[in-house]
Amino acid sequence: LPRAAFEAAVAIGPLFGKLTDAVARDTEWLHKTLEAAGQGDEFTERLLEISRTVNKEGLGQQLQLGILRSDYMLHKPTEAEQKLPLFTEQAGADTGPKQFMQVELNCIASSFGCMGHLTSQLHQYLLSRYPAESAALSAALSNGADGVAPNHNLARLPKGIAAAHSAYVQQGGSPDAVVVFVVQDGEANSVDQRLLE
């Protein structure tokens, strides 16, 4: 992934977070928009039922913490797409990847954030341990193993959860309140989630 593309994805992350928060708070629009998806997917329908019930009863807690993972791909336009104004304005002489496309916005994403930390460390290790085997990649990164972006989620996600707990207590919530992790039976990612403990 080119550094400029990675930095663009990092920069846009907070904007996607704000957009997601605004969408989540517009429950009437959200329910209407996802109605057809719920009819075709039992899990989505159950989430919509929970949301409708909570919305009807009224939120008892105004504080919310969203741990989101947004997955992107770089799209290299076809020749036909390159002729469209969107691409010709951006492209110049470069015919490489032109735009990010969001593949998924995962709202149940606490565990994989921590896995990203470990993946970053793995990439740094492999590049430093086997430089000859990864010469092309090291050249693309320009700084070899030092060019791999660090990932601090293993520290940041638990700090975010702790900050949400602290804010809850400061707003009058019970100081004995606990953070509960709900893990479904047979969850394949339970080991990943334990990184947050």
Description of each model-found segment:
Residues 1-197:
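Preference for protein termini
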